[in-house]
């Protein structure tokens, strides 16, 4: 299993980015509109960590890993068969690939296909 995107939703984007940058020696870029205005940095071994503000007033802070999969439709079907509930069906993000979100065990889980 490989995390392709680690999404961190927080009301303190700059503070979180500064703490991660200081502790890990990474640099966060400018907000990426395609990723909800997340500021991103490279993960060791590939992928990105993205820190963004909530997109709506009701969105709670969350840390959500997106697992890299070869077939996102099949992966979503497998998650549902295992008891997961689809929170966001597969959707294309131009230039980034496709993502989906499901909830299982009270946690958000993401899937990502390049």
Predicted segments with their positions:
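A generic "binding-loop/recognition-motif" signal
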Residues: 12-13, 72, 107
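Short beta-strand element of the conserved SAM-dependent methyltransferase core
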Residues: 39-43, 51, 100-102
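Vicinal oxygen chelate
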Residues: 4-8, 29-30, 76-77, 82-114
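A short, structure-level motif marking secondary-structure boundaries and short turns
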Residues: 1-3, 59-62, 88
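Short amphipathic alpha-helices within nucleic acid-binding modules
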Residues: 16-19, 73-78
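Short acidic/glycine-enriched loop/turn segments that link adjacent beta-strands
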Residues: 33-37, 59-61, 93-98
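Core segments of cupin and vicinal oxygen chelate
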Residues: 1-47
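Conserved, structured core segments of small domains
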Residues: 43-61, 65-69, 80
């Amino acid at each position: 299993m490989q995390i392709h995107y680690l999404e961190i939703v927080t009301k303190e984007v700059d503070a979180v980015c500064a703490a991660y940058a200081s502790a890990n020696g990474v640099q966060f870029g400018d907000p990426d509109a395609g990723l909800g205005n997340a500021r991103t940095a490279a993960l060791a071994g590939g992928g990105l960590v993205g820190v963004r503000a909530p997109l709506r007033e009701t969105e709670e802070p969350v840390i959500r890993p997106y697992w890299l999969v070869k077939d996102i439709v099949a992966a979503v079907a497998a998650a549902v068969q295992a008891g997961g509930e689809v929170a966001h069906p597969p959707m294309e993000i131009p230039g980034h690939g496709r993502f989906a979100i499901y909830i299982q065990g009270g946690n958000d889980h993401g899937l990502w296909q390049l």
